Amino acid sequence: MSTHRTLVVVAHPDLATSGINAQLAAAIRDIDGVTVREIASVYPDRRVDAAAEQELLRRHDTIVLQFPWHWYSVPGVLKEWMDQVLTYGFAYGAGGDALHGKRLQLVISTGGPEAAYTPTGHNRFTMAELLRPLEATAHLCGLEMAEPLVLHGAPRATREDVADHAARYRELLSAVPAAAN
């Protein structure tokens, strides 16, 4: 039986200054079968080697996109990566079935509290509503989208909050092979 492989694409524009995303990445780095890829470090000029990234995606069963929520979307570094890697003929369109049946897991940190992501909250929309474009992308690429793991209120999170979230993240990735079957 082959080992389930998970690719974690960490998309923080400056991971060294991130308290939350750096800790989350560190928490899952040593899990067997998990590859952590910090794309802002790999591509500081944002000139993505699409062929190399596509090969990594081919070799993994689950793709995790870990990122801070910026202006109701993914950070620019992740958008650029998606634009260059998830191309016609690879991820969608004629012959574009390389990702079909793979699992997509989003791991997101937000600045606002959970209450801000409600119809009556500051942002007026739920996270599920705001994530629809990523859900549409997953659908187009034939990916099976898992329930997102979201840490709300990241700037105000206590050490215990971050440790608990990191433990949930680690547990989630450790359980991925069972969930994917």
Range-by-range predicted roles:
Residues 1-37, 169-171:
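N-terminal beta1-alpha1 ligand-phosphate binding loop
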Residues 5, 25, 29, 131-181:
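Glycine-rich phosphate/pyrophosphate-binding loop and the adjoining helix
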Residues 7-9, 37, 64, 105-107, ...:
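Hydrophobic/aromatic beta-strand patches that form the interior of the parallel beta-sheet core
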Residues 15-16, 43-45, 113, 157:
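Flexible, glycine-rich phosphate/dinucleotide-binding loops
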Residues 19-23, 48, 76-80, 160:
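Generic recognition of short, well-ordered alpha-helical segments
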Residues 34-57:
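N-terminal beta-loop-helix "entrance" segment that forms/cooperates
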Residues 51-135:
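Helix-loop-strand module that forms the ligand-binding subsite of alpha/beta enzymes
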